[in-house]
Amino acid sequence: SALLEAMEEEKVTVDGITHNLPVPFTVIATENPIGSSGTQMLPESQLDRFMICLSMGYPEHRDAVDILKNNGAKSLSGIQAVITSEDWKKLQKMAEESYVSEEMYDYIVRLTENTRNHPMLRLGASPRASLALLRMAKAMAVMKGRDYVTPEDVMDIYQEVLAHRIKLNMQAKAQGL
């Protein structure tokens, strides 16, 4: 619950004392395969708090060789920052201030609502999914150099935002979907 508090509220409570986390604050987590020692599935309500789900895939051959040569070293000393905290905050502010038309709000809500009534889904996208889709679409717009959201921005990130939030029903699984 401490991680969820940090993710949702950007603060943590230790021994009854609440501490604000630094801004910007970002959580990047990995997911081990179910069945691995010590792993348990997260409940849907907790999965829903993760904004996006990405598959990193396997490293390219050359990168895999480098990993072996470095003996899997965990040193972060060679990592160089690609953005400052101040620039990150500016980008976040730009995304927050991006214009969203009434039609775009309606579009996002319709996309998530449609998952709730789909005959092949046991669990559709929550209102939190709509919020995540909106935030990510705004970020996509900023990355493309715009201050307004388009349907293309939404569709560019739709799968990554919804994949971990919707669940197939037994019929869909039986059909191999």
What kind of feature is each model-predicted range?
Residues A2, M7-I83, W88-S98, K138-M140:
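Canonical AAA+ ATPase core
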Residues A6, Y58, L111, L133, ...:
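Conserved catalytic core of Hanks-type protein kinase domains
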Residues T30, I67, M94, Y107, ...:
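Residue-level recognition of specific faces of alpha-helices
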Residues H61-K69, Y105, V109, M155:
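An amphipathic alpha-helix signature
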Residues G78-S130:
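Conserved AAA+ ATPase small/helical "lid" subdomain
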Residues N117-L177:
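C-terminal engagement/docking regions of AAA+ P-loop ATPases
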